[in-house]
Amino acid sequence: MSKDCTIQDVFHRFYPSFESTHSISPAQRKAAYHIMNCKTGAFGVNVSVCEDCGCISVHYNSCRDRCCPMCQEFPKEKWVDARREDILDAPYFHVVFTVPEELNPIIYSNQKFLYTALYHAASDTLSELAADSKYLGTDIGYICILHTWGSTMNFHPHIHAIVLGGGLDVKNHWKDNGKDFFLPIKVISKTFRGKYMAELKQLWENDRLEFHGSAAPYKNYYTFKELLNTCYAKEWIPYCKKPFDGAESVIRYLGKYTHRIAISNYRIKSMTEATVTFSAKDYKKQGKWKEITISGEEFIRRFLMHVPPKRFVRIRHYGLLSSRNKKKKITLCRNILGCKKYISKLKDMDAPAIIRLLYNKDICKCSSCGGKIISLPTKQHFIKPKPHMLC
């Protein structure tokens, strides 16, 4: 039994046999290749030498794939830091939009269309209800993030929305509801359900949907109509978490949700010739952690379910936080509220400086003597050094 193994190790052992027996999309195949070859030299190397002692360092490049567990931390820190300048010292709420599990097969067969429909339904629900004078009567700002997994890597598409708890009315006056969320959850539920189902029906009527695997029965009109009736009869359950405790907690929370993938390396507990054991939360037991063992190929199947379609944008900004509005309107909100501007810490810093600040590691210093390291020209031919020469 292998302990201290990584997702890369799991892919090396089980992906080749999985690929030979399963249908895999180009995006999934590309993600698998990137994960297996990240930091192996397949994506090139950076070679540097110490000016003082001559010690040579070879750094293998990462794949930078958004599904790779080894490539998320640095982009996450940069993205979250850039969002500092958009954050107000005002109430924020975390709203989660989910759909009935009966829709999962048809969503998985039509990811690009039906993931996009999730954004449309969630954003239209929040914007339209917030603009209604019965609730707040303002233009609000929020960020929507798509996650497609549950704790066991099951298929569970849902939207996380980080919502500003106030906004600007038609006269550009600030309005909020204090620490209480300004929209009733039941109203959100009914509105979101209506909007998502309307777009799903429109896609079906326009013959835009595909029906693969367990979604095949829904190609029949009567079976599809029965699915719609089942989903309409259900109570869709979005939920709102308690407000954030200040702007810094919003920034930390964004880091928790934005660049997450289906499972991280620390949750992989062990691997055998045939199985993988990982930890997951058991929500039937108040979210307590438990260990789950599944076959290696089943692990690969579950992981690849969460590779997004090519060029699909998972993080989207709306209202006051949209790229069209935020420069003027967030500045206006900040002036009205009299709150300070949170300045980006990493703006205009190069990679070595960011690494030094975040991880207290100076990659420009030799690990042997502390001397200055310089990079060798990329076009220079380089002979692989002997092991004793490597730092």
Predicted feature descriptions by range:
Residues M1-C391:
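Beta->alpha loop/short-helix hinge microenvironment recognizer with preference
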